[in-house]
Amino acid sequence: MSRSSPEQLSRFLAEVHGRPKKGLSQNFLIDGNILRKILAVSCVQAGDWVLEIGPGFGALTEVLVNQGAHVVALEKDSMLEETLKQLPIHLEITDACKYPLSQLQDQGWQGKGRVVANLPYHITTPLLRKLFLEAPNQWKTVTVMIQDEVARRITAQPGGKEYGSLTIFLQFFVDVHYAFKVSPGCFLPKPQVASAVVHMTVKENFPLEEPLRTKFFSLTRAAFGQRRKLLANALKDLYPKERVFEALSQLHFSDKTRPETLSLDDYLKLFYLLSLPA
């Protein structure tokens, strides 16, 4: 019987695990059709190395294994260890936010791999930032199920209310695609919000290397720190307002420009101009 079976999951919860833990965002996927769609979107092939964060009962894990992937799974809940060990995977019972991604090599990880996961919703943003701050060259693709609201932020275009620093951060590293929405009824227990699957293809080359990359993200975080402010005011702690006005003018933006107006490319050009000697 498949691990996406509601009956099998309910029996496991009743006999072994107990109630799903809200503090770990435990909403277990029980829809086989959604699992197959995630697999198709992820482009996982036999022999691929795949990092799965928060495997839970192992429904998605099972699908990845059956595809022939080498799966490294990071699970925080020790109550799930024994059932996950029944699958042919590399399992770490650990806090994914604290796990050094360099340790993947200790599991036999070879070359560039993929991330495929139903991410715990309460730590989605820090996990996504960790993947690209700590090991941006480790991945070919990242396919994750996340809260629909976050998915729309990640895929937002300039000018919209959902567009922000997380959008800029991820689009710096990836080309991102909103794949499909997932209703609460596909989970046990049902979450109170809709979910969505997004697929990210990691760029071959990133616009900036360190230490400039860190400085660039400081600029974009400051820009969106107070969304209602004009961009020049939002950046006043980093750059004199007159310098920002001058740079905006060179990019054909007015002094009244707000943070959500600029694209990633615009922000990169602005950063370049503001980095020039005064």
Swiss-Prot record:
<comment type="similarity">
    <text>Belongs to the class I-like SAM-binding methyltransferase superfamily. rRNA adenine N(6)-methyltransferase family. RsmA subfamily.</text>
</comment>
<feature type="binding site">
    <location>
        <position position="95"/>
    </location>
    <ligand>
        <name>S-adenosyl-L-methionine</name>
    </ligand>
</feature>
<dbReference type="InterPro" id="IPR020598">
    <property type="entry name" value="rRNA_Ade_methylase_Trfase_N"/>
</dbReference>
<dbReference type="GO" id="GO:0005829">
    <property type="term" value="C:cytosol"/>
</dbReference>
<dbReference type="Pfam" id="PF00398">
    <property type="entry name" value="RrnaAD"/>
</dbReference>
<dbReference type="InterPro" id="IPR001737">
    <property type="entry name" value="KsgA/Erm"/>
</dbReference>
<dbReference type="InterPro" id="IPR029063">
    <property type="entry name" value="SAM-dependent_MTases_sf"/>
</dbReference>
<feature type="binding site">
    <location>
        <position position="75"/>
    </location>
    <ligand>
        <name>S-adenosyl-L-methionine</name>
    </ligand>
</feature>
<keyword id="KW-0963">Cytoplasm</keyword>
<dbReference type="InterPro" id="IPR011530">
    <property type="entry name" value="rRNA_adenine_dimethylase"/>
</dbReference>
<keyword id="KW-0694">RNA-binding</keyword>
<dbReference type="GO" id="GO:0003723">
    <property type="term" value="F:RNA binding"/>
</dbReference>
<comment type="function">
    <text>Specifically dimethylates two adjacent adenosines (A1518 and A1519) in the loop of a conserved hairpin near the 3'-end of 16S rRNA in the 30S particle. May play a critical role in biogenesis of 30S subunits.</text>
</comment>
<feature type="binding site">
    <location>
        <position position="118"/>
    </location>
    <ligand>
        <name>S-adenosyl-L-methionine</name>
    </ligand>
</feature>
<dbReference type="GO" id="GO:0052908">
    <property type="term" value="F:16S rRNA (adenine(1518)-N(6)/adenine(1519)-N(6))-dimethyltransferase activity"/>
</dbReference>
<dbReference type="InterPro" id="IPR020596">
    <property type="entry name" value="rRNA_Ade_Mease_Trfase_CS"/>
</dbReference>
<feature type="binding site">
    <location>
        <position position="27"/>
    </location>
    <ligand>
        <name>S-adenosyl-L-methionine</name>
    </ligand>
</feature>
<keyword id="KW-0949">S-adenosyl-L-methionine</keyword>
<feature type="binding site">
    <location>
        <position position="54"/>
    </location>
    <ligand>
        <name>S-adenosyl-L-methionine</name>
    </ligand>
</feature>
<protein>
    <recommendedName>
        <fullName>Ribosomal RNA small subunit methyltransferase A</fullName>
        <ecNumber>2.1.1.182</ecNumber>
    </recommendedName>
</protein>
<dbReference type="InterPro" id="IPR023165">
    <property type="entry name" value="rRNA_Ade_diMease-like_C"/>
</dbReference>
<keyword id="KW-0808">Transferase</keyword>
<keyword id="KW-0698">rRNA processing</keyword>
<keyword id="KW-0489">Methyltransferase</keyword>
<feature type="binding site">
    <location>
        <position position="29"/>
    </location>
    <ligand>
        <name>S-adenosyl-L-methionine</name>
    </ligand>
</feature>
